[in-house]
Amino acid sequence: MAQVAVSTPPIAHEESSESRMVVTFLVSALESMCKELAKSKAEVACIAMYEADVFVIGTEKGRAFVNARTDLQKDFAKYCVAEGLQEVKPPGPANASRMQVDSGETEILRKAVEDYFCFCYGKALGTAAMVPVPYEKMLTDQEAIVVQGLPEGVPFQHPENYDLATLKWILENKAGISFLINRPFPGPANQPGGPGVVTDTDKSVTSPSESCTPIRVKTEPMEDSGISLKAEVVSVKKESEDPNYYEYSMQESRHSSAGTEVIETELPMEDSIQLVPSETSEDPEAEVKIEGNTSSPNITNSAAGVEDLNIVQVTVPDNEKERLSSLEKIKQLREQVNDLFSRKFGEAIGVDFPVKVPYRKITFNPGCVVIDGMPPGVVFKAPGYLEISSMRRILDAADLIKFTVIRPLPGLELSNVGKRKIDQEGRVFQEKWERAYFFVEVQNIPTCLICKQSMSVSKEYNLRRHYQTNHSKHYDQYTEKMRDEKLQELKEGLRKYLLGSSDTVCPEQKQVFAKVNPRENAAVQPVEDVAGNLWEKLREKIRSFVAYSIAIDEITDINNTTQLAIFIRGVDENFDVSEELLDTVPMTGTKSGNEIFLRVEKSLKKFNIDWSKLVSVASTGTPAMVDANDGLVTKLKSKVAMVCKGSDLKSVCCIIHPESLCAQKLKMDHIMSVVVNAVNWICSRGLNHSEFTTLLYELDCQYGSLLYYTEIKWLSRGLVLKRFFESLEEIDSFMSSRGKPLPQLSSQDWIKDLAFLVDMTMHLNTLNISLQGHSQIVTQMYDLIRAFLAKLCLWETHLARNNLAHFPTLKSVSRNESDGLNYIPKIVELKTEFQKRLSDFKLYESELTLFSSPFSMKIESVQEALQMEVIDLQCNTVLKTKYDKVGIPEFYKHLWGSYPKYKIHCAKILSMFGSTYICEQLFSIMKLSKTEYCSQLKDSQWDSVLHIST
């Protein structure tokens, strides 16, 4: 849609802004209709006028027809104005003078607005010079360039079409007006009459300061008036080594005047404007002449029967730091496409490295090089002339694109291309790349400080691509001083890494590197780097928690040092649960509750954790943890109450070690001691073990060997006992033959106790495996323990009746009807212990039920602060359906924002530890990882290993 202004006498009655908005809307609708008609190959041309504005609407050919006949537009405007003036009284002398004053003021304001629009457009292109605004293209493609800051209801158009009041408003509020380039206009189109071209005989474009003499650039057509003259392309280039840059097409214009007609554009010298030929130009012939105090020669690019595109290159100063993010993305796309074409061209000529593509020669010599695999509708050309959508399609089809050299390109020698001489390319490693991309130069080879990978060429594009692809996600967080410190740390790590191989490379210089520990430098440093990234991620994750809980357990490593393991479980606002190892603290000296509290407080402070969000603490239930006077839980509750008044820290003993239950409550040490000694004696001696395996094989027993009992892997207790019981005769025979008889194996009472212990440990193993399920919720754990307690009550009743249905091993050796009665006291001991563990959950049973069964919860049992929201929730059939469909905790991710208090309550319950999985996982890692060699690691290094493992 084109828009033209005509001079009309002012009319006393002006339409309101609402009327203008209606007209603009209807004109836009009419334009949309024209686009649909064009799809059906129908041509439409329409001239519309509103107030002093003339709109040209229609299809591309229709608008071209009307734009080429400006007299027709003026006649139509005069006709409409004349019709309107018939109803207006002629102005008197006073009004006539007023009109002349307003007309003069309007012209001045329009000129000022037009200059400011040119300045804003130039600023959007990245230059301080004023650049003519392509009004017609902007009105045709309104999404390409967006003008922000205009008054509501006033569309962007040429200043000649604004009334006096609008012009004044624009100048008064010009500070808020800006141009935003969403996508640059493509190369010169064949659309005539573009209004963005400077058509005056001497039109100067200067910067607002106008402090320097402008350079005048004349473009003269080389052919007669029948050949269209295309306007300049303004290229904005950031000084760098990359050959690609941005090109923004100014509006073109088709002239039917004589060939001597000249278009002039003046640019200030202070903007460092240079006229250079495009290396990738494939446009027809033209000539650019430079007048003024310049030494640049005339530049002429010729080809048979075609014109050339004149490119004005505007160099942005080095201190230009503010760049549009969209422009940076376009630059990256062009770099990627150019790199792709270079690699494909290199493959075509038989080399394994990228080779600069001769775009001009390929274009002007069709048939020499064939490019297959280009996306449909995309023509091969230099990346500087490709649209954004075309470049993206090319990258998507990268694997399909192939260059084939049919015959040599004229003037291009390919014989020496395969012998790449990097030292002759003159590339120098720049010091600023160390801080930007963490690269250093080692023996003239760029080497990455992070992954130790080297690059063959000191080229910024290659270094930047490596950093952004592999390391930017983790290392962009280091800025300013922290980045400098990290750079020095990585440099020191690289130095040690290189020195670590000195024994192999130069053993004669071994004494020089005697102080260097290769194993520590080559292996530990990367582990610390990886763990450092994980620590930073953990800190970031903790900051997003709305509620969290901690679990504390004690571990003993291979050095017999007690390690206090602190785990954290948190929930963010999206109800995503995270369960991580927070810290491990060696416990030397006393292990009192106060000492443990100080260690925990220090660890939480290290991560800047908010105490007010702490919901619960899970512990082992030892006196140092739960002592009413000086235990850790008591100290933590006091701390939370002091930080956040009214908060009540919950305490649960969810870390259950069944081996302690068996030893302390079942009192079956007389069984375990015999089994453990016998199994370890057989398995720890290779000869004994092999002979025993052979014996079992000859006897065709169920198992080929015994499981080695380990204290740390307590789950093996049940498996060892079961396998031991089923191999009693073989073990008795083998131990007797080796002079180590076991008289207990001949005692029926001892065998019955063993059988009962086998059944009981298998039940406990089943429970604990259920508790160790990953990502368990505390309500699920509560249900599992309640179920096991109910089973204990059932077993007590069955044993009183000598019903051994749930004790199959004991049943297989039972001979008397009273055998079951002997084990009732042991069941009672276990039941008492589990009731004690369950008492912690009983205190919060209503809160847990509200979380797990919100729609069946009685309102009387709900806290008063939550009652209103729970009533609304229970009456919401949509949420009830969602609850039945997805269950918990997935349901709470769909909970609406109208239940803020209930959502916080659910987040707190969800943050409570409901599993011992992560604790048992850490036990296994400690056993497998901390060998006698790894035990020599420092505490900080061992923390890194554990954190990576968990």
From Swiss-Prot:
Compartments (UniProt record): Nucleus
Name of the protein this chain belongs to: General transcription factor II-I repeat domain-containing protein 2
Keyword terms of this UniProt record: DNA-binding, Nucleus, Repeat, Transcription, Transcription regulation
Family: Belongs to the TFII-I family.
Swiss-Prot/TrEMBL GTF2I-like repeat ranges: 100-194, 324-418
Keyword Iron: no
Main location: nucleus
Pfam families for this protein: GTF2I, zf-C2H2_12
Record-level GO cellular component terms: nucleus
GO biological process: transition between fast and slow fiber
